[in-house]
Amino acid sequence: MIKIRIPATSANLGAGFDALGLALTYYNYVEMEESDKVEIRSADGVEVPTDENNLIYVSAKDLFEVCGKKLEGLKLTQTNTIPMARGLGSSSACIVAGLVGANTLLGEPLTTDDLVDLAAQIEGHPDNTAPALLGGIVTAVFDGRKVHWVKQEVFTKLKFAAIIPDFELKTEKARACLPKEVSHKDAVYNLSRAALFSASLLTGKFENLRTAVHDKLHQPYRMELIPNCREVFDIAYNHGAYGVYISGAGPTVMAIADESNEFFGGKVKFSLDNAGLSGWQVHEFRIDNEGTKIIDKN
């Protein structure tokens, strides 16, 4: 039996649509062992598929097939801390758990690059799967087969406050609202800000983040699908956030604050409640630089 720890992820980071993502200190756990049948259970009562449609099982089976092996069955126990359909990489966590677990069971025939590529092929884009696997902040380009990526570990005195509503937003719906084409001007707008985000985060020029998270490719459209989104942004900025953006496809809003900004999450939550937005919860995290880990093996 092996036990796997997989971090939540926050993708896009404002202007870095489908290219930038980072891992957070917020984890799912999966226990996995080979079996002669499919046995899947939830350790914490969160409803998960218990048949061969389970995404962890599907991903593990894909890896076995890539390696020329047949997966007869799998025994899985899932602890799902990461909320589903909230823009925090819950599906990517399942994919990466399945791949890393299966690769470990087979004696690690695939390299890290192989796993990054296979995860992106399953998910369709690497902005959540790559940081879930690698940790840190990851810049990635997916050409349909191969992911070209750079991971950078981040040791900054920042906290990331995930402001999570009590409703879901499916990625399919969040993508369907996006335009088929954008102007050259808007493309340049995003390119410059995506580059500014990474450079500012890594060099400590945090005052740039408010500009760097601005975006014209996805956030203006997705805000219309997230009730009270603009008000949540305003509240976070009023309490001193460096930058605020929609995490992944949403509906979670991520606020970046300085470590010295004491009780930031609590102050944001207090203001949300006073504004009649008590359905939004606030959780503070740091950047996870380790990525997915095998934390027990016997």
Which positions does each model-derived feature cover?
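Glycine-rich beta-alpha junction loops
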Residues: 26, 36, 136, 164-169, ...
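FAD-binding core of FAD-dependent oxidoreductases
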Residues: 8-12, 16-23, 88-95, 123-138
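Short beta-strand-to-turn element immediately C-terminal to the catalytic PLP-Schiff-base lysine
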Residues: 33, 132, 138-143, 254-258, ...
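Alpha/beta catalytic cores of group-transfer enzymes, especially the acyltransferase/condensing modules
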Residues: 110-157, 244
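DPxDG-like acidic metal-binding loop motif
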Residues: 26, 88-112, 133-138, 143
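Active-site rim beta-loop-alpha module in soluble metabolic enzymes
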Residues: 162-224
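Glycine-rich, charge-dense phosphate/pyrophosphate-binding loop(s)
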Residues: 201-298
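ATP-binding N-lobe of GHMP and related small-molecule kinases
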Residues: 1-86, 100, 104, 108-110, ...
